[in-house]
């Protein structure tokens, strides 16, 4: 049965702010305490989603988390009314409050790992929410993420949902930001490519020294087992620890792949040639590797431009489109090399630029904002149709953003108890628009 790749982008939440919470993410740290614009951020994301839908692609939406997360603050000892909890946290633990206000769930590449039915033993699409243990502000996402995924992909005849891996560093799982699937046609049994930063149970292997390796080898193995994948169609590779120490905190900051194309930097992986050899053997056929040398683009340029944090998409006419953030065009070296790649006709046919400045300032480019889900025709029909982008939904969501979102949010605004009221009102309305049911704690 014919299958297509759908992209489910994260909707930016009403509390989008720059609190510098992500150690190892250069942009996040650099822009700490800057004023954010949640309304603009949400609309930039919606514009990208609508553009892809207008290209004839399947584009879905994943709802944001409930923030401020008063429930987590209560678990941490803050008591009284919601307003009292916010007030106490602002005075006693402002960094904890900031973490509980993060809108980082917009980056749905970290929401989960997804395996299509063509790859799994039971013939279902499998979802495992990422535990994101390395960062507190993200580690509190996975329960709600699981409920949102189950409300979006509800049909048990087609979709299998797992719990997140144990929430300890040994099984640190960053989701699809460290996962790519290669194939020749989407409906064929593909090769799933997992990338990790370190071994948790074996210190003999190299690891980064400056910044944390967020994803473990053991987490990759666990997801392979949960999703019932076969070993001859799986490749597990280690990310180069040296580039993690230069700000490449996920593999999708240094590599992107789709179908039979891998686009990556020459320093992306440990033992890179061996990785290429295994991928080439397992994918078979015409597997294309587009490698960018350091002499053309440094790691620093890759990180600041987010060249590889791009979307590699097959268009309805069969051409391959590379979706890039505007920052790539603003970097002369990067933009020149992009033109070289296009002109060489190595497997990427066209480029499209999007303005995602609000997300980029927190360290999230086009690839961060989307979760890829390969679906056959029956599975696509089984998806919650209210979450699929079209003209009507685009207009409804823009009106919703105008009604509920602030133009600016600063660190000081996070202490405003009214932010809880506004955010819950927004999310309550959103669950009705997207037909999600009661996925949030305040609704349960």
Curated annotation (Swiss-Prot):
One of its GO terms (molecular function) is N-succinylarginine dihydrolase activity. It catalyses: N(2)-succinyl-L-arginine + 2 H2O + 2 H(+) = N(2)-succinyl-L-ornithine + 2 NH4(+) + CO2. Pathway: Amino-acid degradation; L-arginine degradation via AST pathway; L-glutamate and succinate from L-arginine: step 2/5. The active site is at 174, 250, 368 (nucleophile). Keywords: Arginine metabolism, Hydrolase. Its EC number is 3.5.3.23. It holds the Pfam family AstB. Substrate binds at residues 19-28, 110, 137-138, 214, 252, 362. InterPro entries: AstB_sf (IPR037031), SuccinylArg_d-Hdrlase_AstB (IPR007079). GO terms for biological process: arginine catabolic process to glutamate; arginine catabolic process to succinate. Belongs to the succinylarginine dihydrolase family. Homodimer. Catalyzes the hydrolysis of N(2)-succinylarginine into N(2)-succinylornithine, ammonia and CO(2). This is N-succinylarginine dihydrolase. It comes from Photobacterium profundum (strain SS9). The gene is astB.
